[in-house]
Swiss-Prot record:
PROSITE patterns: HTH_TETR_2. Induction: Expression is autoregulated. This is HTH-type transcriptional regulatory protein RaaS. Residues 28-47 bind DNA. Disruption phenotype: Knockout mutant is impaired in long-term survival at stationary phase and does not persist during macrophage infection. Residues 6-65 form the HTH tetR-type domain. The keyword Transcription applies.
Length: 212
């Protein structure tokens, strides 16, 4: 594909992410094309259909977040972590898109969030191999828990924010309010001992044995 085509492809995708995030998935291809500075025919040329365009947006958003998370978890350099935090407002279009996906539901939304869970399992494993993340008894379940609570928690925070339509401000405030408490829980733990965990684990294992 010619470089000009690649540039148009990326420009359309970026405009679509912004338009979907701002107006919802009911926005038309003509509006997306206008925002990208191209014709609706060129959108179809690159993506085939509106569903194809949304799928491309899903893939891009999921990969951008996976890449960012992996870089943070594999690094021992505070400069990397603080640099990402300084740029958190730049993630506003991606987060607006994810919020719309959570709110819209449907098969495409389920597919996107399944991909997010898959990616979480992948970057957590990268952290384990890098020695920055503790191994898990059940890596898949841990990834699912973190992806769902992370996405749902941000959605709830956004609903409680004084200006929920301003994603840049919401992300800035979210980082201020939530990063240190979450890091404390992840790093120091919450419960004073393993008694509750061991009790529920034994119960789960006993149930699995009965099923087997």
């Amino acid at each position: 594909m010619r470089s000009a085509d690649l540039t148009a492809h990326a420009r359309i995708r970026e405009a679509a992410i912004e338009q979907f995030g701002r107006h919802g998935f009911g926005v038309g291809l003509r509006a997306i094309a206008e925002a990208a500075g191209v014709s609706a025919a060129l959108v179809i040329h690159h993506f085939g259909s509106k569903e194809g365009l949304r799928k491309a947006c899903d893939d891009f958003v999921a990969e951008e977040i996976r890449s960012s998370k992996a870089a943070a978890l594999k690094s021992n350099d505070p400069t990397t972590w603080l640099a990402q935090m300084a740029e958190i407002e730049s993630y506003a279009p991606l987060m607006a898109y994810l919020v719309r996906s959570m709110q819209s539901g449907g098969e495409l939304a389920k597919m996107l969030w399944q991909k997010m869970i898959d990616n979480a399992e992948e970057y957590l494993d990268e952290g384990v191999r890098a020695g920055t993340v503790k191994p898990s008894r059940d890596p898949r379940a841990r990834a699912r828990f973190l992806a769902i609570t992370g996405g749902g928690g941000f959605l709830l925070y956004l609903q409680m924010h004084e200006n929920p339509t301003d994603l840049r401000a919401a992300l800035r405030d979210y980082a201020h309010d939530m990063v240190l408490p979450s890091l404390e829980v992840y790093t120091e733990g919450l419960l004073a001992d393993r008694a509750m965990y061991e009790a529920f684990l034994a119960e789960a294992q006993q149930g699995e044995a009965h099923v087997g």
